[in-house]
Amino acid sequence: IGYEKVFSMLKNGGAFARFANHPYRDKENVELSQEIDKIYDLDYNKYYNKERETISGYTEQQAKEIAMIASKYGFSDIRYELFYRERVFSANEYIELLGTYSNHIAIEESIRTEFFAKIKEAINNHGGIIKIHDTIDLQLARKG
């Protein structure tokens, strides 16, 4: 529906730009990542009755495939660009970030509180910081 709405709103020659952020958790600190994965299994995945998802970095091939979706809705001159950044969080800052994610907010409060406390403890036990490697995907397309 989104592509159709954007296409109908644009004049001929109008441009559509879409940004998406794809965070990848601390690939240098494997032990911390493994501990956080276990915490997710015990709390988050159990709450949502999900299996652990394999976490990997966002690739150029994925960016290309997603950008090309616009062609199905009549867009042309389709391009994409990837940008990279690293964010460093203290344990408290990272918990504050997680607290902004709708799928984390939706967890029943007592479970969420314990879940966040475990993640905070894991980060503090592994140096007190966590790095997030973002791949920012810019997709551009034109009507007409």
Pin down the residues of each PLM region.
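Conserved Class I S-adenosyl-L-methionine
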Residues: 57-144
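Short, conserved SAM-binding segment of the class I
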Residues: 2-6
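Conserved catalytic/acceptor-binding region of the Class I
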Residues: 7, 11-84
